[in-house]
Amino acid sequence: MKVISSIHELRDQLRGQNRTAFVPTMGNLHEGHLSLMRLARQHGDPVVASIFVNRLQFGPNEDFDKYPRTMEADIEKLQKENVYVLFAPTEKDLYPEPQEYRVHPPHDLGDILEGEFRPGFFQGVCTVVMKLMSCVQPRVAVFGKKDYQQLMIVRRMCNQFALPTDIIAAETVRDADGLALSSRNRYLQAAERAEAPRLAAELNQVREAVLGGERDFAKIERAAMAALAARGWQPDYIAVRKRSNLLPPGPEDANAELVVLAAARLGATRLIDNLEI
C-alpha cells in the first residue's frame, strides 16, 4: 500500500484507473470502516482510502483538537485489507490557501436534524468530499448508513453536480450489544459504555411502535426522548422521517419508506444512530 499526501502524486499514481473505489475517513479506524473497504472492493478496483480530520466540519466548541488520531495503527489495518493507496494529506496539502469557496447543501436537508445542532457541519462535509472526489476521481465511493443524513446529502450533491461517482451505502456495523461502532465511542467512561446501547434500544422501540400501527409520530418521538432523559441522557432529537428526503412523514406514508434518526449526549460524548423502519 502506498501512503500519499500530495494531490499531484496521488493523481499520478491513479492515472489510467477508471474503476477506482474510494472510502473517505477521518481515521481512528474500527471494524465499521474496514467493512466499507470490503464493500468498496466488491464495486471497484483499486480501493483508495483517505484519512483527513477535516477542520471545516467541526464547530468552535467541538472535538477537533482531541479527535483521536491513530495513523500508524490505521495504516496497519488498511494494509491487511489490501488497500491500494492511502491518501493522507496534511491541512496544507488539501487546503494550501484559505478555502474561500464552500459547498452549501440546501437548507431543507442541510439545516435540519444534525444541521440544526451542528451549524456549518454539512457545509464542511460537502466541501471536503467535493475536494477529495476531485483528487481521487473515483468510479464509486462508499459511505456508511450510520451517518444517514450525510449519506443522503453527499449522494444528492454528486447527482446535482453530475460527478461521475456512484455512491454506495454500507450497513451500520454494531457491537454485540447493539451500539453502533463509532470513533467517538472511545470517549465513553465504563458506566457510560454500559448504558450506551440504550440509544439503539429506543430506536427499536420507535420502530416497533410504527410497525404496530402508531401514526402519531410526534408522540412516540417525545416518549423516546423522555425515556432517554430519565436515564441521564441529553437527547437532541429522535425523529421519524421519510427516507427519500428526511421530511416528516404523513399518516399515508408506508412504513418501508421511513427511518428513525437520533442524536443524544451521554456524559461528554455525543452519539448518533438511526434505524430504517
Curated annotation (Swiss-Prot):
Catalytic machinery residues: H33
GO biological process assignments: pantothenate biosynthetic process
Molecular function via GO: ATP binding; pantoate-beta-alanine ligase activity
Subcellular location, record wording: Cytoplasm
Residues that hold ATP according to the record: 26-33, 144-147, 173, 181-184
InterPro entries, sorted: Cyt_trans-like (IPR004821), Pantoate_ligase (IPR003721), Pantoate_ligase_C (IPR042176), Rossmann-like_a/b/a_fold (IPR014729)
Catalytic function, reaction form: (R)-pantoate + beta-alanine + ATP = (R)-pantothenate + AMP + diphosphate + H(+)
EC number, as in UniProt: 6.3.2.1
Pathway, per record: Cofactor biosynthesis; (R)-pantothenate biosynthesis; (R)-pantothenate from (R)-pantoate and beta-alanine: step 1/1
Main enzyme class: ligase
Keyword field: ATP-binding, Cytoplasm, Ligase, Nucleotide-binding, Pantothenate biosynthesis
GO cellular component: cytosol
Entries under CDD domains matching the protein: PanC (cd00560)
Binding site for (R)-pantoate: Q57, Q150
Main location group: cytoplasm
Further remarks about this protein from its record: The reaction proceeds by a bi uni uni bi ping pong mechanism.
Quaternary state and interactors: Homodimer.
Family: Belongs to the pantothenate synthetase family.
Role of this protein: Catalyzes the condensation of pantoate with beta-alanine in an ATP-dependent reaction via a pantoyl-adenylate intermediate.
Identification of the protein by name: Pantothenate synthetase
Organism field: Paraburkholderia xenovorans (strain LB400)
